[in-house]
Amino acid sequence: PIRIERYVSALGHTETDVYLAGTQEWSVGTSAEPFDMESNLALVAGVSAASMVAVEAAMRKAGVKPGDRVSFVGHSQGGLLAARLAESGRYATSSLLTVGAPLGTVTLNGNYPALAISHSDDLVPELGGASKPTGITHFETHSGAGTLDVAGAHAREQYVATAERVEVSPARDSLPHWEASGEAHPQFFQARRTDR
């Protein structure tokens, strides 16, 4: 669930984009999968999580060093991870994009373009607490999923469709803009817990 792309921007900067998937395993304390419910609980509480350790290990393996320019993108648990990494102070965060992420316990400094997309019928973003952090632009809309389709409202595919609608809507003009450039070289990482 970890994708890392490195490239040289038009301005000559080495840039890294880190894409993080959501929860892969719903158990607590029994799975070797670090993107599990145990990591969800730890991340919402603001303490160390196995998924965070896995992402930072993947970043090191991809050649990312402290202080490097990094853009973080994530869905659900991956979005919460992205926000925590963006604010960790270990990287020069270029941007942050989260979708369906429970961000209520995260404090964002606002020193970079940041966008949180959520669905009004998705319960997961509310699991982080009722407050919405400052320092990030919030875009909320209905998912388009069925009336009682709670899982559908949180599905990555629904968020892809929402992002496509945002791209062509007038709301796009009020959202943060990112400049894409350079040829990216993707690397994919799968992590396992070694303590189980």
Q: What spans do the regions from the language model cover?
A:
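Extended hydrophobic-aromatic, low-complexity segments
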Residues: 82-83, 107
